[in-house]
């Protein structure tokens, strides 16, 4: 990850088995960690009380009195066509990112193969989509998009590596980006994968764009600006 901002402060923060690499100013480590752990506890407790929320691979409908944050996860994963369990890490990243943005106005976070970005000016973000260090693309993060969530195949577990060389999804949140990324990977194993995957990305509300890489073919959907 590369953020072109001179006075940003970078630090690692651990939330259960997640490691968040945070670039933000000022240094809000303690407040940030307290906020993240509070949300994680809420998420974990809700999943224990509502088993399908934490185990279903398919969309889950929650009761009307469910906490707003859990309703948001269920709604966004349903848009993608998958269960809430696939977006837990993205939801934590979103929560931390929104907290940091409320304190300092901007933040960049990387976690595994996901990124959260909110900046005041056009920023170049290098996202890695494969297993090698040179499997990276520099994309432009434009402030007009507001909060940006990015899913990539870098560092993901149990990927169908024979089906995709790289996948990048840009969405209005990490929660949505993660959920859409999971569904898109399934499409990559089907006939005519690029066409099906790009059409899917263009049809989901909240998805800003995506890049699909397979063999020598690259497909681009939506408002993705690749930096020179």
Task: List the model feature ranges, each with a label.
Residues 6-8, 126, 217-228:
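Glycine-rich anion-binding loops and their surrounding alpha/beta cores
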Residues 44, 48-54, 92-100:
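N-terminal subdomain of lithium-sensitive/metallo-dependent phosphomonoesterases centered on the IMPase/IPPase/PAP
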Residues 28-33, 176-178:
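Short, conserved charged micro-motifs
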Residues 1-28:
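N-terminal basic/disordered segments at the start of proteins
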Residues 46-61, 106-107, 112, 190-221:
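Flexible, glycine/charged-enriched surface loops at secondary-structure junctions
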Residues 31, 40-41, 45-50, 58-84:
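An interfacial alpha-helical scaffold signature
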Residues 20-22, 114-118, 210-213:
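Short beta-strand scaffold segments in enzyme catalytic cores
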Residues 71-82, 86-96, 100, 104-197, ...:
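Conserved mixed alpha/beta catalytic, RNA-binding, or beta-rich assembly cores of soluble enzyme
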């Amino acid at each position: 990850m590369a953020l072109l901002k001179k006075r940003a402060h970078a630090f690692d923060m651990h939330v259960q088995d997640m490691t968040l690499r945070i670039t933000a100013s000022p240094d809000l480590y303690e407040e940030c960690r307290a906020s993240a752990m509070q949300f994680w506890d809420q998420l974990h407790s809700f999943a224990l009380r509502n088993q399908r929320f934490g185990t279903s691979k398919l969309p889950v409908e929650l009761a009307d009195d469910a906490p707003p944050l859990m309703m948001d996860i269920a709604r966004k994963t349903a848009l993608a066509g998958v269960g809430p369990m696939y977006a837990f890490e993205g939801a934590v990243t979103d929560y931390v990112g929104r907290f940091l943005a409320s304190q300092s106005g901007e933040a960049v976070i990387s976690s595994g193969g996901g990124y959260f970005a909110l900046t005041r000016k056009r920023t170049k973000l290098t996202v890695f989509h494969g297993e090698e260090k040179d499997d990276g693309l520099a994309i432009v993060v434009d402030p007009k998009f507001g909060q940006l969530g990015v899913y990539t195949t870098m560092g993901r577990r149990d990927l169908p590596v024979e089906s995709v060389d790289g996948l990048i999804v840009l969405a209005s949140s990490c929660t949505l980006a993660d959920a859409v990324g999971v569904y898109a990977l399934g499409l990559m194993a089907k006939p005519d994968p690029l066409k099906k995957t790009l059409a899917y990305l263009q049809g989901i509300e909240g998805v800003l764009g995506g890049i699909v890489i397979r063999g020598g073919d690259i497909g681009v959907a939506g408002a993705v600006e690749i930096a020179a």
